[in-house]
Amino acid sequence: MRKWRIEDSEELYNITGWGTSYFGINDKGHVVVTPRRDGVAVDLKELVDELQLRDVAAPTLVRFPDILDNRIEKMSSCFKQAAEEYGYKAENFIIYPIKVNQMRPVVEEIISHGKKFNLGLEAGSKPELHAVIAVNTDSDSLIVCNGYKDESYIELALLAQKMGKRIFLVVEKMNELKLIAKMAKQLNVQPNIGIRIKLASSGSGKWEESGGDASKFGLTSSELLEALDFMESKGLKDCLKLIHFHIGSQVTKIRRIKTALREASQFYVQLHAMGFKVEFVDIGGGLGVDYDGTRSSNSEGSVNYSIQEYVNDSISTLVDVSDKNGIPHPNIITESGRALTAHHSVLIFEVLETATLPEWDDEEVIAPDAHELVQELYGIWDSLNQNKMLEAWHDAQQIREEALDLFSHGIVDLKTRAQIERLYWSITREINQIAEGLKHAPDEFRGLSKLLADKYFCNFSLFQSLPDSWAIDQIFPIMPIQRLDEKPDRSATLQDITCDSDGKIANFISTRNVAHYLPVHSLKKTEPYYVAVFLVGAYQEILGDMHNLFGDTNAVHVSVNEKGYNIEQIIDGETVAEVLDYVQYNPKKLVRTLETWVTKSVKEGKISLEEGKEFLSNYRSGLYGYTYLEH
């Protein structure tokens, strides 16, 4: 058998599929990140080792700002190419909805690099608007205001507009339009009004119900006519600058996008025919990320189109309908936050230990006085072959069930139960090995690989770092960052360190279908083993929660140039004291309470003075230490 090659690992984990030229494997068998075409590749294993020297322990979230920059440039260049091809005569505006990742360093990097690309921000709530107005200092870039609004929200936006911000208030419900009219009159400002339209078209994938008739937001055709009459009656006809639609996040099928664009373009035409000179069409989000690298519409974690195809369809549809009706091309706004941010963040954590189902030692023989069920099961294991495997499987299951029932009634002892378990799982393993080599294996054996997978316990919280994996079964690319020049010899599910049975990852990307285990390597006592989760830059940080009081992980920002990489910033993860403070425990008060208790225990002779000091020292140290396990 030939030696395992790096190309085999590339195929196994499909890194060339989902990696989008950013991720690969080097000659050392390490995962590398190439944020820029003119920059170096960052070896993730070497980066983790350097961070360890700097006392930055895993789990660590690694952000690559250069990837953010590249994503902005990619989207902008796609629009430029499409504009030239289809004779588009208006402007495109890339808008970043900060709900996707509101972390200040992320937003500031997007704003900084996006200035020359007409990049603006979208706020979907009052707190987000407060952030957006302050950080978006470029007076030429757009600010789009979505979400539910009250008077203070609208007043803030209108006053910011009065001072020079290009702010658009998008009406989600009819009562908002009335509030905008009222506040605009009080403040003596001509508002830039947008209207979100509820299309009949919907997206595809997990967020299909975000669009269509079941959509939470938007005005129906009847409500739109009511809104138009209201604006005309209030002298606000010229204030309607924008129409907006959104058919859902992560749209998997380009056909759904095309259908929505055709429907939305007719609203643009009809409004112009009614004398409403709309200038902007905001096509919302929906531009998907190919998480599994299969370019397939059948997978919720993939998409069957490229950014260029998405942009081509957007521009060509609106150009075509505008030219046919003799109206100006609209300025096109896109809100593709997921596509901008997903690739730039990588979560890295260490595998702490493993758990494997018991197995029978090949050299072990059973004692003559062993229980008859043990002897019978041993005989099945000893004579197992392909011809008898289905019958053997049925017999093994029956014997195991009988043994467990006898144990529950106190008839067989613990030693016998343990022997039954070891033999049963050894039989199961051998049957699975035979079945995997068959072209047509019995259906009963399909779930055995999942059942037999090891458990790799990892130093992270699924709920804090990968909430979508738990909440909506989102599948992210996951693989070891080292030893990729070696053939993986184990199959495992990943278990986090929360005290919750849901804290696990048991679905992984596969070129054939979803896999229920991850190919990994046996652990070495002398070498830490790291696993990385990729494409986690969208939504995961901001949606994460503190289940079991695990806080934010350490985060580092890594930039690259022609000579190498630089660790630009290290953001310490949350301490135990910080997360306790979130849930209204005063750390200082906790220490004082413990000091009183320890003093009392010393006086009562329960512990010595030195033991009391040691306990308090450990408590204080732990209180201001990392919430994750430390070596």
Ranges and model annotations:
Residues M1-V31:
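Charged, compositionally biased N-terminal leader segments and the immediate start
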Residues E7-S9, E73-Q81, R104-E109, L129-H130, ...:
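Short alpha-helical segments and helix-capping/turn motifs at coil-helix boundaries
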Residues T20, I25-Q102:
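Low-complexity, highly charged intrinsically disordered N-terminal segments
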Residues H30, D38, I67, N101-M103, ...:
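Short, glycine-/Ser/Thr-/acidic-enriched flexible segments
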Residues A58, V62, E84-K89, M274-V278, ...:
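Flexible, glycine/charged-enriched surface loops at secondary-structure junctions
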Residues D66-K74, E226, E263, D313:
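A non-catalytic, amphipathic alpha-helix used as a structural packing/dimerization or gating element
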Residues G87-F280, L287-G293, N304-E309, T317, ...:
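Active-site-proximal beta-alpha core segment in soluble small-molecule metabolic enzymes
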Residues Y305, D313-I315, V319-H631:
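Charged (often Lys/Glu-rich) extended helix/loop segments that serve as interaction or gating elements
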